[in-house]
Amino acid sequence: MESRVLLRATETVTGVPQLRRPIRAINRQFSTASSSFTAFAKPIGSIGEGGNLISGRQLRPLLLLDSLPEKREILKPVRAASAEGGDSAGETKVGFLGKYPWLVTGILLLMWYFLNVIFNILNKKIYNYFPYPYFVSVIHLFVGVVYCLVSWSVGLPKRAPVNSDILKVLIPVAVCHAIGHVTSNVSFAAVAVSFTHTIKALEPFFNASASQFLLGQPIPITLWLSLAPVVLGVAMASLTELSFNWLGFISAMISNISFTYRSIFSKKAMTDMDSTNVYAYISIIALFVCLPPAIIVEGPQLLKHGFNDAIAKVGMTKFISDLFWVGMFYHLYNQLATNTLERVAPLTHAVGNVLKRVFVIGFSIVIFGNKISTQTGIGTGIAIAGVALYSVIKAKIEEEKRQGKTA
């Protein structure tokens, strides 16, 4: 029909007499063509949105049908059904958790706190009858690696491919992670859990120092001032800590330095891989890093009397069960911390991390009945308050930078 209309338009320009055809014949022919189109044409969308198209051509007869008053009532049910069908096809059904994302975030935070507290308590209980932190650190990573391999085998999540370039950037991160993990456990085994976490509250101070003096990134004076209470509080707590010894103190400080370098290398090792796969690969590499020191430092003692003493105290079943579950709790709480970070703003995660440390210190004191002096308690409180202040200020600065880039 289009070719006929174009032909008539051409003839109209070249020969005006063509217009003398009877009006009734033209109307009859047009109405016949119109009815033939409407017989097979089905409405696809609204006209205003470019709908009612077949092979890219808009069906004009429907416009004429729509313009007739007696036809409008006929078209209303059809349009309503079409709109309902379009809505149902265009929108996916949202589940209960999808409707309430804040509920998912809250559950993740609670699980993160719960698993972290359980890990620290169970970890310290193991050290009370099995004081071999190098070996226990290997068990933490080994159980996590097995968990990752099983998850990959069932496709939850799907394993991301890795190549030599990715390994080059992940290996430094994994080495720092391994050193920080082992030294943290050495400190946990040597002193009270609450004291180790108080020392580890200095980690932001090391991060700021590394950023300022190693990376050349200027740190605002407000951040430095917020770190003063942290240093003061840790110093007060250390001077009167009843479980203080230099091995626990120095190990916790080395852990802070190691995790600081891990943060530096992590910034340089940004990849397109998701966080779950990244943490899995880091755990695998860290496991191989931790194995040699564990064999060299604690291997002979373990074979001589370490395993036998532990089994004699708690039994084989409990010993193996404790090692398995402490490894599971370690891996899961770290994974949940990463997943929570992806769902919330940096400020929320920073405050959550501070509150987590408060929970761990508080529960460890209650569970183990650790006696602390008044000065140690005040110093710990000042240090935690300083970390909270630092975290809030830093998160706000990062948010302002992010908004400035997007503006």
Swiss-Prot record:
Any one Pfam family match given in the protein's UniProt record, by short name: TPT
Compartment(s) of residence: Plastid, Chloroplast membrane
Membrane topology: Multi-pass membrane protein
Keyword terms: Chloroplast, Membrane, Plastid, Transit peptide, Transmembrane, Transmembrane helix, Transport
Transit peptide: 1-79
Membrane-side (Lumenal) residue stretches: 123-134, 234-277, 397-407
GO cellular component, one term: chloroplast membrane
Alphabetized InterPro entries for the sequence: Sugar_P_trans_dom, Tpt_PEP_transl, TPT_transporter
Chloroplast intermembrane side, ranges: 80-101, 156-212, 298-375
Principal place of residence: plastid
Molecular-function GO terms, alphabetical: organophosphate ester transmembrane transporter activity; phosphoglycerate transmembrane transporter activity
Listed transmembrane segments: 102-122, 135-155, 213-233, 278-297, 376-396
Protein's UniProt keywords contain NADP: no
Family the entry assigns: Belongs to the TPT transporter family. TPT (TC 2.A.7.9) subfamily.
UniProt subunit comment: Homodimer.
Protein purpose: Mediates the export of fixed carbons from the chloroplasts into the cytosol in the form of triose phosphates.
Name the UniProt record assigns to this protein: Triose phosphate/phosphate translocator, chloroplastic
